[in-house]
């Protein structure tokens, strides 16, 4: 027995030693023509039988002993590629990616002697070059260069892409329902009850591999997009074993260690991005709240159960910080390849806005007066703390012609904010109001996706099943407004004073299944078909509570005073503060949506230089709604509110003017559906903007016809010149319209016919052609110019009289003013400009980047009656980022960055005829300085 143990031990030592001498050659073999992985390609050592074949993704892995080799890549009907001087190091992975050209004339093999490592930015351009769609994108390498910590900062550098409110993507000036975001090719729900689009700031760049923005439709894509589809790809497992850790700090002068910074005491788990329960409603939401006149002791108990903190507190803002960790590997077994990837990311950020303000102006009732009348100013300070963490765990197994992968993504964030402002009314009340606002918003997304890929001789099958669970929870939204009259604080409701608490909860479940089939039927021709099913369910409710005061004439201006024990109403005293239930049935609804889709398309060459992709997609959509109005006269119980069957044709043509130059054209039909909230009878009051959203159960979906033309020239790896034009025709375009009689009430309406025209230009160029000393420098810019037109005669501003927006605007013209019968679409930027200047040392251990972004004056809020339009003023964003690698094997890296170098402010202004622009809202985000350290183990 002892000899057996010794023998086994010796065998293990020998095996371990032998394995230690092994290294790996890994990479991907691509078909140059179609930019897809080459299936069944041969990879072997020249002059031997030692080798392997590529899988159906074009990937290969070849274990080799330490040494230098000549590697041969071959496949039937392709030019053979020979790569010399490939060095294999024990226990390390050598990456070698190659592109193979079709050998239609049986040309002789081509030999190269350089290592064909693929650059990530160049790879994105190669995908653009070979794609059947017009698209733009960003790689993880670009994320590193520009230094953005989350997707909302990074994606605005893509041609024609802007970000509204730091969260919402607009493609070609079209946002919300007109831009769709997918995660790993599958639909995901949004995290805002007021928006259709996904809040992209939930995606830290640390977990992302690339982002592709599809600007033209093809039948294999979702039909409900118009501006574009933003597909976010999370990191796949690496080709070699990697472990990395990064730590970051950032400061904004005037935020950190500022004695005036405000917030409030939160919960014990705020640092984890979720509430510990201390902000939850302290009693059952169905509990009956007695009327004060009943002198019921239960009223006192319920009032005292609320957290008494109502005012902001001065606190310390520490430097913002980030922490990320990643670990991944690819493991080769006999006939099986395993892989895994784990990415963890944590961020804690502070913001402080001094002199933050939002105001209300309107036109004078006298048409001879051009200057705008000041109705109300709201000026104060705002402090924020945002905690966000995410975790990505993925694994995959590949064997023969099959692979399976699973990916789990969890993103959690919590945002605390405190605002203290002075509101001054200039209307009939002329009141001065002191306002404290305390909020907490908790957002979470849990995404799981399983992907299977199979190659059955010629037939390729890919299926995906994705499940998403998301929640937006606003517990204990507190607003205390105190009026001041002759220096004395009062709780005068006539002046707009009051005490309110809101509890808002949105839960959404989304499951999608998708199957795609690809069948080649001729040389360079294939037929694709597939199907998809998507189910969405949303539950939404708001609980609203008002506090009143009885029998006390002298109060404090401190919001915490009202719920101090001695100031709470009791049955004996019948004086003090007490709670009033204010639940409105219209603030609660349930809705669901079913979508079944299928498509068929073909891709073929009509002539050697002209590729055509055409087909049709069918989508059947149903929406159901459960809810009621406040009076109970309208009741919906899982009632169908939408039932549409649409056929969406598409034609894409790609003409190769040369090997590196394409001319593209595309014609297709897409659509946009109303959101759950829009297609409802909900009436939801926003205590911050003081606007009431009113749903429209009769809202119809929007149908869009799209025409695109693009010329592109890929000069060298990483270099590009492109020019695009596009046109979009909207039928039943959806606009958020203010009521004629009450501009603070807004309702979504179908706005008839609208048109969008645009052009895009992009150039990326290395500057070595100027002089050899410019090697490593690169310059790039992209510009989008967009014009949109909404027919004012097709937009109705009331329900009964059918008054059009054009009639209402004409009625309120100033003397000498004339208007057109069209205006821009809301949110449509007339131009977008991005520019960058990069320097990267040939060794790649030093990179410096200066980037600039701006978008033109944009219609932000559509005016109504005497309320004029509100426009966003161009914000000039100039950023600097640099990193330096150092240490043993360059495993350490220091990154420094500066954002908003120009210290520009974000402004929105009222615009009137021959009138001075007046501030609607303004704040200064400040200049941020950051430093980050990365280490690769």
Give the role of each language-model region:
Residues 430-451, 583-596, 642, 671-730, ...:
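Outer-membrane beta-barrel signature, preferentially recognizing the C-terminal barrel domain
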Residues 87, 117-170, 176, 185-203, ...:
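Periplasmic N-terminal accessory/gating domains of Gram-negative outer-membrane beta-barrel systems
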Residues 30, 41-44, 74-76, 89, ...:
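Short, acidic, small-residue-rich periplasmic hinge/interaction motif at the N-terminus
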Residues 48-59, 696:
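Short, acidic Ser/Thr/Gly-rich low-complexity loop/linker segments typical of extracellular
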Residues 305-419, 443-450, 649-651:
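Transmembrane beta-barrel wall of Gram-negative outer-membrane proteins
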Residues 499-506, 515-521, 526-527, 651, ...:
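Conserved C-terminal beta-signal and adjacent last beta-strands/turns
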Residues 725-729, 747-858:
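Gram-negative outer-membrane beta-barrel transporters
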Residues 186-187, 421, 471-473, 490, ...:
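Surface-exposed extracellular loop regions of Gram-negative outer-membrane beta-barrel proteins
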């Amino acid at each position: 027995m002892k000899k057996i143990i010794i023998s086994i031990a010796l065998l293990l030592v020998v095996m371990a030693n032998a394995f230690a001498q092994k290294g790996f050659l890994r990479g991907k073999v691509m078909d140059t023509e179609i930019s897809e992985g080459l299936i069944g390609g041969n990879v072997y050592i020249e002059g031997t039988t030692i080798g392997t074949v590529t899988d159906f993704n074009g990937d290969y892995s070849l274990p080799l002993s330490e040494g230098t080799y000549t590697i041969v890549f071959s496949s039937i009907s392709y030019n053979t590629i020979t790569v010399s001087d490939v060095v294999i190091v024990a226990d390390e992975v050598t990456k070698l990616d190659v592109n193979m050209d079709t050998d239609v004339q049986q040309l002789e093999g081509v030999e190269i002697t350089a290592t064909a490592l693929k650059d990530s930015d160049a790879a994105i351009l190669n995908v653009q070059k070979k794609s059947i769609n017009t698209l733009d994108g960003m790689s993880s390498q670009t994320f590193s260069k520009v230094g953005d910590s989350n997707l909302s900062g990074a994606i605005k550098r893509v041609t024609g892409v802007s970000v509204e409110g730091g969260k919402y993507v607009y493609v070609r000036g079209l946002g919300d329902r007109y831009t769709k975001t997918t995660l790993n090719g599958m639909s995901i729900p949004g995290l805002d009850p007021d928006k259709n689009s996904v809040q992209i700031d939930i995606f830290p760049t640390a977990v992302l591999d690339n982002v592709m923005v599809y600007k033209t439709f093809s039948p294999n894509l979702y039909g409900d997009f118009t501006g574009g589809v933003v597909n976010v790809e999370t990191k796949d497992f690496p080709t070699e074993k990697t472990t990395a850790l990064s730590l970051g700090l950032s400061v904004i002068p005037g935020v950190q260690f500022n004695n005036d910074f405000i917030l409030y005491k939160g919960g014990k788990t705020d640092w984890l991005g979720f509430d510990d329960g201390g902000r939850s409603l302290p009693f059952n939401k169905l509990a009956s709240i007695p009327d004060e006149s009943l002198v019921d002791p239960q009223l006192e108990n319920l009032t005292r159960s609320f957290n008494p903190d109502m005012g902001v507190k001065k606190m310390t803002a520490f430097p913002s910080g980030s922490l990320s960790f990643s670990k991944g590997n690819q493991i080769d077994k006999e006939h099986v390849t395993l892989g895994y990837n784990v990415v963890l990311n944590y961020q804690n950020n502070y913001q402080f806005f001094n002199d933050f303000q939002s105001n209300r102006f309107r036109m004078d009732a006298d048409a001879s007066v051009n200057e705008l009348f000041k109705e109300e100013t709201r000026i104060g300070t705002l402090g924020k703390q945002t905690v966000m963490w995410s975790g990505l765990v993925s694994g995959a197994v590949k064997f023969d012609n099959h692979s399976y992968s699973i990916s789990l993504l969890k993103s959690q964030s919590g945002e605390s904010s405190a605002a203290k402002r002075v509101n001054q009314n200039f209307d009939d009340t002329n009141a001065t109001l002191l306002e404290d606002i305390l909020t907490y918003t908790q957002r979470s997304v849990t995404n799981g996706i399983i992907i299977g890929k199979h190659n059955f001789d010629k037939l390729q099958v890919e299926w995906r099943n994705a499940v998403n669970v998301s929640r937006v929870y606003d517990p204990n939204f507190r607003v205390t407004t105190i009026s001041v009259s002759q220096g004395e604080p009062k709780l005068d409701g006539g002046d707009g004073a009051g005490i309110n608490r809101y509890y808002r909860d949105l839960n959404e479940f989304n499951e999608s299944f998708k199957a795609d089939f690809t069948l080649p039927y001729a040389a360079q021709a294939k037929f694709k078909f597939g199907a998809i099913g998507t189910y969405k369910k949303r539950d939404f409710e708001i609980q609203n509570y008002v506090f009143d005061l009885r029998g006390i004439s002298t109060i404090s201006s401190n919001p915490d005073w009202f719920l101090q024990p001695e100031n709470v109403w009791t049955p004996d005293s019948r004086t003090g503060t007490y709670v009033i239930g204010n639940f409105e049935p219209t603030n609660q609804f349930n809705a669901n949506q079913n979508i079944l889709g299928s498509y068929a398309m073909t891709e073929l060459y009509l002539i050697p230089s002209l590729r055509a992709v055409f087909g049709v997609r069918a989508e059947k959509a149903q929406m159901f709604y459960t809810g009621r109005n406040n009076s109970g006269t309208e009741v919906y119980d899982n009632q169908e509110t939408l039932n549409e069957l649409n056929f969406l044709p598409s034609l894409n043509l790609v003409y190769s003017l040369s090997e590196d130059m394409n001319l593209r054209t595309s014609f297709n039909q897409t659509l946009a559906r109303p959101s759950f909230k829009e297609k409802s009878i909900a009436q939801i009051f926003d205590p911050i903007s003081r606007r009431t959203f009113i749903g429209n159960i009769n809202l119809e979906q929007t149908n869009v016809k799209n025409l695109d033309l693009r010329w592109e020239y890929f000069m060298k790896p990483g270099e590009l010149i492109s020019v695009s034009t596009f046109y979009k025709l909207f039928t039943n375009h959806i606009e958020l319209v203010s009521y004629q009689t009450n501009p603070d009430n807004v309702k979504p309406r179908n706005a008839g016919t609208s048109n969008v025209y645009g052009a895009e230009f992009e150039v990326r160029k290395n500057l070595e052609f100027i002089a050899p000393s410019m090697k490593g420098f690169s310059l790039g810019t992209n510009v989008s110019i967009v014009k949109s037109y909404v027919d004012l005669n097709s937009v109705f501003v009331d329900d009964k009289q059918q008054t059009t927006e054009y009639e209402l605007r004409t009625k309120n013209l100033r003397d000498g003013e004339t208007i057109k019968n069209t205006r821009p679409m809301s949110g449509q930027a007339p131009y977008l400009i991005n520019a960058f200047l990069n320097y990267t040392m040939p060794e790649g251990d030093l990179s410096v980047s200066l980037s600039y972004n701006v978008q033109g004056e944009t219609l932000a809020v559509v005016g109504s009656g005497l309320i004029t339009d509100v426009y966003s003023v161009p914000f000039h964003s100039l950023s600097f980022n640099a990193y330096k690698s150092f240490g043993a094997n360059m495993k350490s890296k220091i990154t420094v960055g500066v954002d908003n170098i120009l210290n520009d402010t974000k402004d929105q202004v009222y615009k009137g005829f021959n009138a001075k622009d007046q501030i609607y809202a303004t704040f200064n985000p400040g200049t941020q300085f950051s430093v980050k350290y990365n280490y690769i183990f």
